[in-house]
Amino acid sequence: ARHHANEVSSTNAAFILIKKLLTEDVYKDLPDKLNLVIVPMENVDGAAIHYELQKEHPNWKFHVARFNSLGKEFYYEHFQQDTIHSEAMGLTRIYDRYVPDMIVDNHGVPSHEWEQQFSGYTSPSYKGFWLPRSLLYGYFWYVTNPEYKDNYPVNKVMEDVIADKIAEYPEMRELNREWSAQFEKYAHAWMPKLFPANYYKEMINYWIPFAADPNHRLSLI
């Protein structure tokens, strides 16, 4: 959790999970079935920056605290043994030691991103910054190599489980429906290629095929 240090809720979620695992009887046999590693705060320098900034403005987004002390998105430094960004070695060492079947990278939404329209602001990677709010959506990056064909149906099951769990919470479901209507009215209806909408159980999921590449920045590829 807390790879992006201004996304505080990811640390909170990690601690809530730890509490549930330690206090609820339904999970008491879990240690006999799996190895679970929880990292509540990966980006400690960014968290220190965020802590100082929030003293003056506790409700601001503080995008400057998203990265590490050098202003680096050190995600790209994972699995780079010669990196100068030592915090990136945390995940690398965990991966080498445990060879996990699954990694959950908790993020969070600290506040709304609001960019003044036609102001000249540009962010090529995230067209969603154009929107003050967005519905819940998912990305499935799946490998197309024949030897990994069993991964695709696993992802489809995950798609169902996630959508069904979100639908169990009436407030989240109603907010998602509201934001879906806004997304349709102001984005997808006007620019369907830029804002595609592949709806599935009241969510939008994007399926991105890739050939397996051991040098890809995403370990799942």
Annotated model-derived regions:
Residues 87-102, 112-221:
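C-terminal accessory segments enriched in acidic
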Residues 7-8, 217:
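Short, solvent-exposed loop/turn elements at domain surfaces
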Residues 8-150:
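Active-site/substrate-binding loop(s) of hydrolase catalytic cores
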